[in-house]
Design a protein with these regions (language model features):
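Class I SAM-dependent methyltransferase SAM/SAH-binding core
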Residues: 41-91
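Conserved Class I S-adenosyl-L-methionine
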Residues: 182-251
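Short catalytic micro-motifs in class I SAM-dependent methyltransferases
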Residues: 106-110
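Short alpha-helix
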Residues: 164-179
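A conserved beta-strand element that flanks and buttresses the S-adenosyl-L-methionine
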Residues: 103
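Conserved class I S-adenosyl-L-methionine
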Residues: 1-38, 51-55, 72-75, 132-163, 206
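A short glycine-rich, Lys/Arg-flanked "PGG" loop and its adjoining helix->strand segment in the class I
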Residues: 117-129
Length: 251
């Protein structure tokens, strides 16, 4: 499992940095409710380094970030001083009905089935009536676009041996329904700089970065790497993934 405290210093640089974060924040903006009287209370649950969180902050909003990693939270606090708290997304340190928006960006796919269900339940608990949960869905599916020759090769094996995704849209909708949340809107955004070259796919498959390689077996993974090695332009990044965002409204 990734040591987030140890990774904190260079976490953003290995995950698309400002370009990807900016695209995510811009997409979230299109789903946020129109400005109303008073202050819109936004909580970024699992905020990581705060690279998206800080982009949501502006006059008329009270934005806080929550993360369980002290290392990531420290980076986030340097971006939003006094607005970051240590805490778990399955036990948010917030009163029931106390916020207008909960965002979860690239979070649910990292959690187990049980914890992702708890995270959605917690979002439902802390949201006020009419509030929104805005979350990425199907995060890992985004890398397997039809225009990507390398990903299509990998996708055949992944479809057979990959684990069920805890952030599938239909699953998130069902989890939300149990908490009185209903799908209100969807949008997409491009994961800038996240396209993967055939050589990088081979590197990932050879290491332990992909969870299903153990189930596939070394012989099958080696054959997959050999097929990838036969593609042209080994170091050319393929198209950037297109991520999905869903907004669920509390009734």
């Amino acid at each position: 499992m990734l040591d987030y405290d140890r990774e904190a210093a260079h976490y953003d640089a290995t995950r698309g940095g400002n370009a990807r974060a900016g695209a995510a924040a811009d997409a979230i903006e299109t789903l946020l409710p129109a400005a109303a009287e008073g202050v819109t209370r936004i909580v970024d649950a699992g905020c990581g380094t705060g690279i998206v969180t800080v982009r949501l902050a502006r006059p008329g909003r009270s934005v806080i970030g929550i993360d369980r990693s002290a290392g990531l939270a420290a980076v986030a606090a340097s971006r939003l001083p006094g607005r970051i708290a240590l805490g778990s997304v399955i036990r948010l340190p917030l009163a029931s009905g106390s916020v207008d928006v909960v965002t979860m960006v690239w979070l649910l796919h990292l959690l187990s089935a049980a914890d992702s269900a708890e995270a959605v339940a917690e979002a439902g608990r802390v949201l006020s009536p009419g509030g929104l949960l805005i979350t990425t869905v199907g995060k890992n599916d985004a890398a397997f676009g039809p225009a990507d020759d390398a990903a299509m090769i990998v996708g055949v094996v992944r479809a057979r041996f990959g684990h069920d995704q805890t952030d599938r849209l239909n699953r998130v909708i069902e989890l939300g329904r149990r908490q009185g949340l209903a799908l209100a809107a969807q949008t997409t955004f491009v994961g800038m700089g996240q396209g993967v070259s055939p050589r990088r796919w081979r590197h990932r498959l050879a290491g332990d970065a992909i969870s299903w390689t153990g189930a596939a077996g070394r012989e099958r993974v080696d054959a997959l790497c050999a097929e990838l090695a036969g593609l042209s332009d080994q170091d050319r990044a393929r198209p950037d993934p297109v991520y999905q965002l869903a907004a669920l409204r509390k009734g």
